Regions:
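Conserved small/polar residues in nucleotide/adenosyl-binding loops
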Residues: 222-223
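Ordered alpha/beta subdomains of enzyme catalytic regions
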Residues: 1-217
């Protein structure tokens, strides 16, 4: 995982603390939020699997170090320190799918000052995005408790990763399946789908498009 997935000020603060000899101080960070999304009354926690992968693989490779060196704002000794950076602390979190409220700690981070600073941006990115999707999914499930709900967010996601992990978050929120084939394979999510307008446009008559689809996929109800 690219160690540059962070904000510049996290690195400059860590650089300055390193120069002062304060970079290995033990700290505890609590992560919480101030306002529920969608003007709602709760939030659904999601993102912990993604977060775990992010933390376990967060490191700086040679290209990362060379880029940071080119910025000419970091001490050489700090860049040497980053070459071997690995998270060695502990993270405690509320289970995924839990209903939480503003001001409650969702995650508690035990580590060094440097670890907390370098990882904070990525942790926030992951939990903010996936908890948002899970919360929306739960709100939809609440008003449609007996309906089959399918997640089709890939084509409007803000990038590949958002589409992949967003599909998983929707399942945490209560959806039944996803159109995202990669998410189905990776996370064991049921893959679902209908058909696109391009299929209908491939036929002279609309009814023929529907009949042919039913003929080829016998699990569909033919009427």
């Amino acid at each position: 995982m690219n160690g540059l997935i962070t904000d510049l000020y996290q690195l400059t603060m860590a650089n300055a603390l390193f120069n002062k000899g304060r970079h290995e101080r033990k700290v505890v960070f609590d992560r919480f939020y101030r306002k529920n999304p969608f003007n709602g009354g709760y939030t659904i926690v999601a993102g912990l699997e993604h977060l775990q992968q992010f933390v376990e693989n967060f490191r700086f490779d040679e290209e990362d170090i060379n880029y940071l060196e080119s910025l000419q704002i970091f001490y050489p000794a700090f860049l040497d320190y980053l070459k071997d950076f690995r998270f060695k602390g502990d993270i405690y979190a509320v289970p995924e799918g839990t209903v939480v409220f503003p001001g409650e700690p969702l995650l508690r981070f035990h580590g060094t000052t440097t670890e907390a600073m370098l990882l904070e941006t990525g942790l926030s990115m992951i939990m903010n995005h996936e908890s948002l999707i899970a919360t929306k999914a739960r709100r939809v499930r609440t008003v449609a408790p007996r309906d089959a709900l399918m997640e089709f967010g890939l084509r409007r996601a803000q990038g590949h990763s958002a589409g992949l992990w967003g599909a998983r978050a929707a399942m945490i929120g209560g959806f039944n399946g996803t159109s995202n084939v990669e998410a189905g394979k990776r996370f064991g999510i049921p893959v679902l789908g209908t058909m696109a307008h391009s299929w209908v446009m491939s036929f002279d008559e609309e009814i023929d498009a529907f009949r042919e689809y039913v003929r080829q996929y016998h699990c569909l109800l033919y009427t």
